[in-house]
Amino acid sequence: MASLTDLVNLDLSDCTDKIIAEYIWVGGSGIDLRSKARTVKGPITDPSQLPKWNYDGSSTGQAPGEDSEVILYPQAIFKDPFRKGNNILVMCDCYTPQGEPIPSNKRYKAATVFSHPDVAAEVPWYGIEQEYTLLQKDLSWPLGWPVGGYPGPQGPYYCAAGADKAFGRDVVDAHYKACLYAGINISGINGEVMPGQWEFQVGPSVGISAGDEIWVARYILERITEMAGIVLSLDPKPIKGDWNGAGAHTNYSTKSMREAGGYEVIKEAIEKLGRRHREHIAAYGEGNERRLTGRHETADINTFKWGVANRGASIRVGRDTEKEGKGYFEDRRPASNMDPYVVTGMIADTTILWKGN
């Protein structure tokens, strides 16, 4: 008799041309992820081959009960690391039945920015460092921390190994491999300064694909922590006191920045970002004021400053970029719970399209 595990891992490829497509979308809070699956004829190689779908928006905080239908538009596809085979994960955005983007659809505006000829010509690259915290289920307390107590002070945990310093590595490595399998351009992982906190990096990714890849990487991480009985937190300051917060540092460059003379373009872009500091901060994640205090490798939320190799700055420029006179810079302001569509689109808009008026 087949076990549950046998059935979960059942390979359908030799008995049907149908596949399972898991449609994923961002829920009403702007940070929660929802998904549901449907059967389609495979193989699917492009999202345009997939049908639109709908869901009950009144149950996700995205539509009233008397007119609850929200339409899913498939936008990007990835291999499904859970069902494997030809099965796929589908990143969608959300519209009214009349074809208007709903308020929580932040992808639509970002796609408009990235499709602008001036932005497309600059081929914007993003590398996003997604920090997160693993929590003990039912306790809302970091993994590896004594119940009701605290571990030793920060210092031994960053990029560390050992049962007393690294907590949750099996989840981290499972996520790393699952993202590679899915086709996400995940570029690395590391343990963070606060115990129980980790980071993965996605990129370089071009334009709108950076947001798609971060959202699907988050979805995969949610599924893996679900399987492990661990809770994923993207709170930018999960523990009060002398503990690091969690951010989503966003590395960015344009074609002009990557070419000879690019350092001057970088400085001009940073100057523009400084002039729109308040607008960016307002869009860079909920609760970020608890993280951006001027301590724990952050700049104060009300102050904009940049520097070379300065992790206490709003914008950090690397030593190699300064030396070579071209390259990229890092926006250190985004919180771990930021919407990558908002952040990437806003950076491109400010640095390329905005004329500074």
From Swiss-Prot:
Record function comment: Plays a role in the flow of nitrogen into nitrogenous organic compounds.
Tissue expression summary: Found mainly in the cortical tissues of seedling roots, stem and seedling shoot.
- Taking the first listed entry, what is the main subcellular location of this protein, grouped into a coarse class? cytoplasm
What is the official name of this protein in its record? Glutamine synthetase root isozyme 5
Tell me, what is one Gene Ontology molecular-function annotation carried by this entry? glutamine synthetase activity
The lineage is: Eukaryota, Viridiplantae, Streptophyta, Embryophyta, Tracheophyta
- Keywords, sorted A to Z: ATP-binding, Cytoplasm, Ligase, Nucleotide-binding
Supply one GO CC term from the record.
cytoplasm
Q: Which PANTHER family match?
A: GLUTAMINE SYNTHETASE, GLUTAMINE SYNTHETASE CYTOSOLIC ISOZYME 1-2
The record ties this protein, via InterPro entries, to: Gln_synt_N, Gln_synt_N_sf, Gln_synth/guanido_kin_cat_dom, Gln_synth_cat_dom, Gln_synth_gly_rich_site, Gln_synth_N_conserv_site, Glutamine_Synthetase
The family this protein is said to belong to: Belongs to the glutamine synthetase family.
**Record's catalysed reaction(s):** L-glutamate + NH4(+) + ATP = L-glutamine + ADP + phosphate + H(+)
Q: Where in the cell is it found?
A: Cytoplasm
Supply the EC number(s).
6.3.1.2
Domain GS catalytic positions: 106-357
Q: Which GO terms describe its biological process?
A: glutamine biosynthetic process
GS beta-grasp domain location is 19-99
The entry describes its oligomerization and partners as: Homooctamer.
